[in-house]
Amino acid sequence: MLEHYGLWLALGCAVLAIVYGIVSARWVVAQPSGNARMQEIAAAIQEGARAYLNRQYLTISVAGAVLFVLVGLFLSWYTAIGFALGAVLSGLAGYIGMNVSVRANVRTAEAARHGIGKAMDVAFRGGAITGMLVVGLGLLGVAGYFAVLQGMGLPLEQNLHALVGLAFGSSLISIFARLGGGIFTKGADVGADLVGKVEAGIPEDDPRNPAVIADNVGDNVGDCAGMAADLFETYAVTVIATMLLGSLTLADTGSHAVLYPLVLGGVSIIASIVGAAFVKVKDGGSIMGALYKGVIVSGVLAALAYWPITQSLMRDNIHGATALYACALIGLVLTGLIVWITEYYTGTQYTPVQHVASASTTGHGTNIIAGLGISMKSTALPVIAVCAAIWGAFHFGGLYGIAIAATAMLSMAGMIVALDAYGPITDNAGGIAEMAELPPEVRNITDPLDAVGNTTKAVTKGYAIGSAALAALVLFADYTHNLQAANPDQVYAFDLSDHTVIIGLLIGGLIPYLFGAMAMEAVGRAAGAVVEEVRRQFRELPGIMAGTAKPQYDRAVDMLTRSAIGEMIVPSLLPVVVPIIVGLLLGPRALGGLLIGTIVTGLFLAISMTTGGGAWDNAKKYIEDGHFGGKGSEAHKAAITGDTVGDPYKDTAGPAINPLIKIINIVALLLVPLL
């Protein structure tokens, strides 16, 4: 039955996710938005976030229009249309999610007057909207475009190549959103901390800090819109890569191997919607426990639903239905492992963060040394978990089994993005409560919500990196199989005795480091400009510190918008240009080496940066909670320095490596006909 109705089931589930998002958005917007001061602050955050995203998308649209024409001329117009569709849907998911996030923040602050349960409901529903839109629009784009191409009577191979264009479009938006949003948010954060906390001695989110609105805007454009675009891209890319690999390696199953990942994605949406309903917290209850309960319910329901689907669609494949079901379970288990490992390295209740906090008591240098040590050590367990998952999935289902494990892992993206988007909402809610001078009992509710939000943001970055590594591996398998299919008389082995493969390997290994350096330097320049601007305002408007003059908040927002847009263009085009040059000049074997090199160093660098940055951040928060002398102590000052280094590590360079790895692989896949 599913072979006839599976595509419609996937489309129906995608529409259901979008309907859930719309209904939830209407519910969130209907909640009370507080007093006039709260609404004024929220309006400033909304205006800044909207202005930044509009400028960002305008810039991307120019680059996108050029690439659309080039893809159409050199490959096919079906691929070019897919490229445009992927870019538009990815941008839409981030834009709508961010617009809801900047409305949910003030409503969460107001709901905190009535207890933690109500505030949690508003914050999580606000995040769940972004999560469901990511998977809903992602699946609708892939399944919908595939259905249209099938309806036109095009051959399966041509349909799937057009879908690779969709993956490329979503990847382009993702790297721009991740990098641009990261430069904005961390330029604001570092600038606000250096002058506000260190020089002026005022607390975080103090309304006297001229960069405070820019800091709150940055939370939304980086952690909400940026993560939405990142996981939209990973989700779409993984499903498309699995469909393509199914058509190449399991041709004997007809269209079943192509349809299977779409149906898995569809039923996982239903599981995520049900799981979201279980996220409730009572006074005195565990906030993190409530969020994890939603994730566990979603995972268990998805695992139960996968069995009949696998039996129906894949019983006749060479591996057997039970083996492929085991691959899907491996993907779900890997999700849980990555979440747990990342929380261990970034949670304040565990040894790594406490070690960095303890090192802060002996100075700034020892804090940095301890943080770097944790960042390097934190790569071991996630990489071992990914390796074990690859080994297990290949044992049961070959390369297609690895692809199914990746698809199952990404099928949880709805719930995982909800956890991430919850973070900036609670962060902003605490900031609004502080700036609007709400009673201390409100901060007593927003602070623990925000503390959990910091952990969920770290956890989702770990998930995004782990899933990106699997997705990139599947794309590499697609590249090698496509290359062989296009040139059946050639044998393509990526032999380390071949000098071109070694050259490609080394250039590939270099790219994540070069890209990361560009991102870090961009944040440094942006933060430096913010520091100068905040110092200028304190100097020229002495009434700010006394509370008699209002800071010029819009100056920092405008400055960061211009800086982030200008700084993101060159690094974002690096993964598009380099594989084209290597592929056309050195050939397909060198290009294969390039892909492997990028996957390996990119995976380690991304984990190291995001986890290490999270440990620095939470070490500062651990001290602020009263340990090692608390706020204002020498240990606290050293921890602020560590957090200042960790901020661009975990929120700009590290996360932007995810889309970098996948874009290089997608560009290589598109280049196959030209090699």
Swiss-Prot record:
It is a multi-pass membrane protein. The keyword Metal-binding applies. Substrate binds at residues 186, 650. Mg(2+) 2 binds at residues 216, 219, 427. Its EC number is 7.1.3.1. Keywords: Calcium, Cell inner membrane, Cell membrane, Hydrogen ion transport, Ion transport, Magnesium, Membrane, Metal-binding, Translocase, Transmembrane, Transmembrane helix, Transport. Coiled coil: none annotated. One of its GO terms (molecular function) is magnesium ion binding. Ca(2+) binds at residues 617, 643, 647. It catalyses: diphosphate + H2O + H(+)(in) = 2 phosphate + 2 H(+)(out). It is found in: Cell inner membrane. The record marks 457 as: Determinant of potassium independence. Its cofactor is Mg(2+). The chain crosses the membrane at residues 5-25, 65-85, 129-149, 164-184, 231-251, 258-278, 287-307, 321-341, 384-404, 405-425, 458-478, 500-520, 568-588, 590-610, 655-675. The record marks 178, 223, 230, 651, 662 as: Important for ion transport. One of its GO terms (cellular component) is plasma membrane. Mg(2+) 1 binds at residues 189, 193. Pfam families: H_PPase (PF03030). Homodimer. Belongs to the H(+)-translocating pyrophosphatase (TC 3.A.10) family. K(+)-insensitive subfamily. Proton pump that utilizes the energy of pyrophosphate hydrolysis as the driving force for proton movement across the membrane. Generates a proton motive force. This is K(+)-insensitive pyrophosphate-energized proton pump. It comes from Xanthomonas axonopodis pv. citri (strain 306). The lineage of its organism: Bacteria, Pseudomonadati, Pseudomonadota, Gammaproteobacteria, Lysobacterales.
